[in-house]
Each structure stands twice: as C-alpha cells, then as structure tokens.
C-alpha cells in the first residue's frame, strides 16, 4: 500500500502525506518490513495514453498505473520515498504480457534536489520538487538540422531534449512494452521543522537502492523481470544512475538501508543508462579546469588562471593515479594525451556522424559557417584548440563545484548545489575538497570527519576503480553533449574507461553540438534495452 492509495485502486487524485522529517520516522516503530513492503497487485488504475515514439509514430497504450507506493517500512518522508509503476496491457489494441519484460527504472533527480512521484497522474509524471525539469514530456525525432544546435536543459534540470523537444524515456519504454518504474528520492534541500537537512548525501542513493530492493523483494508479484532492471537518469540523476549501477549490493550502504526499513533483498541492477552525469565530485574541479580552463566566462572575462592552473595540476595527478586505458586500444589516459583521446574517440566521430546525417546543402552551409572543420566526405577532423573555441563560454567559474565562498542567498537553490549536497544537520553548505576548504578557512583546515565516507558513498568511480565491485552493472549506456560545460568531458569518458577495463559492455558517445541534458538517440537506447535483456517484442 502506498500514500494516497486505497485497497484495490490507487488514488490518482489527492495525496495524504505521512512525512516524518522531524526525525520520528527512521528507527521508529511500525510495520515490519515483510508486512509493509508486499506489493498489492490489485492496487492500480487503468489508464490510456497516446505516446509518440522516437520515429514519430503514435501508439495508443493502455496500462495499469500503480501510484505512490512507499518502498521502505520506516520512511523519513513518504512524499519522496515512494515509486510509481506503469505496466502495459495493450499497445495499439494488441494485448501485451509484461510478466517478464525488462524494467525501466527511471529517476527524475536533477541538481541533487528531491524528486517525487506523489503528484503524478500517469507515466512520465515524476519530477524534481521545487526545481526545474522532469522526466515527462513528448519524445522527439533525432534528425539533425543544418544549424549548430546548442540544445540542452538548464543546469540542475532532470529533463532530456532532442531537436528542441522534451524526451520522456518512461513513456518511450512503456510504448515499447517495458514495465516502467519511477522512483522518488530525497534531495539536498529538504529540511525538517527544526531546520535540519534530511536529504543530503547519501540519502538519494540510499533511497534508489531501497526502491530496487522493494522490486526484488516482490519478485513474482511485481510485473516485469527484476533481474533485468535498466536504470536511467540525467545530470545529477545520471550520476546517481551510474552510482546505482556501480555500487550494486555493496555492504557500504547497509546501515543506511536498515535505518529506513528497506526490504531484505539485493539492490544490484542489470544495466545503467547515464546522461551527462555530474559525478566524481571530489575531482570535478580539476577535471573542469583541464577541459574548460582557458575558455572565457559568459561575461568575456577569464576565470582566475592561478586557481585554474593549480586545479589542472590536481587533475593530472588524479588521472595518472587512475591508470585507465582508452577504448579501442588507445593506451594509458593521462592529462597530456586526453585531448587527443577525446578528439579521436569521441569528438571527431560525433561531428562526422552529425555531418553525415545532413543533406548536402545543409552540410555545405554548416561547413561554411564552421571552417575549423576539415571534411573529407566521410570524416571530420579539427584541433582541440579549435574545438574549445567552437564551444565558447564556460558555464562555471573556478572552482566549478566546491566554491571558495558559500552563497548568501539561500533562496537560490542551484548556487552552491554540491556544497549543499554535503551539508549536514542545520549546516546548509560544507566543503568537500581540501583545496577549497583551505582557500576558505586557511592552510591548517581539515575536512569534516564524515565527508570522506560520504564521498565514497556518492562516487561510482570508487566502486569501479578503488574497490571494484563484483555486484556492479555489467552493461553501460553513457551519453553527453559535446558542448556541455556543466562538467568536464573527461568525467563520462573516465566512467566509460573504468567500466570497460573491468570487462563490462560499454556504449559511450557524445552528441555533436548538443548541450546539457541532450538525448538524440533515445530510440536506439530503447532498442538497446531489448537487445541487452534478450527480450523479444510481442
């Protein structure tokens, strides 16, 4: 039974919340996990919707909609610790048996903000609470245009775009015959009556793991194949999707999961989809300066180049320590050769694909406007310096993530977002790197004692590089716009290289001229799910 539900039919209307953010929830009495976390197979509404697929074709889909199911026995805040499930019944009038269909597990986290499905009235209705973006919206064709698109969403958005239109993976997945699960999760801005933050790290990943455990504990009751869970997310949601995949069944989270009454089941997932993941946070400042350090700000001014140089040096040391090798036999990845790797492995192929998809006249127009590109009729080539000039202004100042000085306007929820993610108690912002901490507080300052553990809990690279996790996802779909300066282009590339080194299947590419939140091959991802899961469409 979930919030707003009655026996037999989930209430799509109003919502009776039982938020226990004052601290009464965790560790309090109540139903045992086994009693509270049994999926009610009859608790659905039957809905019908028209979904436009990635090729532009419309499909009438009738589905069972299970609304706002609380997935833990001792919730801190049910508004966020609940999930929706959508199960296809008929597609274009043809009956669908989704008993063993893949499960698309689509989070709508953005900016590490809270996300809720409590007010959703159907599939794709989840979204950030009090923030921008969401998982909803119509799908769009991925056909390229002649102009240089800068398509994308705002920083902190969980939305995806293609051709200027919103993309909804939950809706596309449902139209493909998959079971769609949309989990809510706590986020960094949530405060109780005493002003204490209860959604900061590691709450978001703990909640997503608890949602997976709920599904696995209800194997045979929940429709769909719980051994074929495909996680998706964008921006911070892409980061936690990658983290969910990398950290499957890790014992590091057990204490947190026990505290909220998570089901006694595993939390490993089969495959991970991550779009523009804002991750590897403790190393993101250095990576950002390596990538975008010489690009001017939108004001035309340069970021502090002394700071930028110091952070680039940190990145070089970090990158060398990873001991990663590039895909396709490139060899060791270092700060010295990463530009060459980005060009050969990702950026030039991305430009080639884009140009190859244009009509002859559109291609001629584009190349005339972008003379830095050499085109031989099949392949595009250019230099790293010219690519940086093409992208233009960097989106963030230096340092990009762990700010030297915290914001004074607490109403701006995106300023100091990562410092807020590592806040605790009534402290809104905290440093999470020694470099920024010491710039702010002095050379002798030390990180708070709990921060290193929380960094490990929030970083997929820990589970792929530092302590390779046997329970991780073995299938990865990673995407990023080439013009996305919300984080460094190396972040996704390192994630892909780390998973590839462990023998995992990795599909990773960049969308040419696209910004933050781009998803121009959503149809390919939907097909990849079926192929990877071994699922045959009915």
List the model feature ranges, each with a label.
Residues 198-220:
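Alpha/beta-hydrolase active-site loop
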Residues 21-100:
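Catalytic-loop region of hydrolases
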Residues 284-288, 329-376, 381-383, 477-484, ...:
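C-terminal catalytic histidine-bearing segment of alpha/beta-hydrolase fold enzymes
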Residues 109-206, 245-247, 514:
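Cap/lid segment of the alpha/beta-hydrolase catalytic domain
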Residues 75-81, 161-162, 247-258, 265-266, ...:
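Mobile cap/lid helix-loop segments that gate and shape the active-site cleft of serine hydrolases
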Residues 98-112:
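Short beta-strand element of the alpha/beta-hydrolase
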